[in-house]
Amino acid sequence: MNEFCILIFAFLLLSLFTVNNDRMQKRLFWITIIVLLLTSSALAQENWKPVKEEAGIKVYTKTESGSEYKSFKAEMKVNCKIENIVEVLKNSDIINSWIVNCKGIKLLKTEDNDQYYYIETSLPFPFKNRDMVYRFQYIEINSEQFRVNVTGIPEYIKPREGIVRMAKTNGFWLLSSIDTSTTAVTYQMHVEPGGLIPAWLANPFIVNVPFSTFKDLRNIIQK
């Protein structure tokens, strides 16, 4: 998409200097400006900034359009087959052992290839804990790729007293086979925490979320 926009921009820019008609030049000028702004915006939204690389785990953050809160993405490789990782991700008995800052968790429903979880997340004083109902959708793309979509459903159950319901959560896990015994794991999320947590305070802390989650998950997978 970005390459296409850049090509259009280059064509318009070239036309701007070769067209002799004044009215046409003005139109091309404004069209060129609009395309440039759209292209710059698209590029900015897709640029992931590396913020941490340690213990074989890479973490990136990105500014999202229309939000003060950044998204995170983490990547790692594990010595394990895709199906073994999926088995761990689906195991409701151990999910609280690898989700970071998990204060409480309950499997609400299993439906076909979907799981619905209620999860309470611990936050440091003076902030109240957050909670959300998450829908995990397990999708086998092909024999070498598996995706888990993670979507928050804030209205699924009534809010609990003393806990702030998150406004929005959305992300996914992507498992890609590298060879018969190695899998690349990508974990990406964007969260709107709700309440009165300023973005300047929240954004630096999101780096630890995927990093700690990956470390704990890898320890379980590679036991």
Ranges and model annotations:
Residues Q45-K223:
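Eukaryotic helix-grip
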Residues L7, L12:
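Short polybasic linear motifs
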Residues M1-N2, Q222:
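Generic detector of intrinsically disordered, low-complexity segments in short proteins
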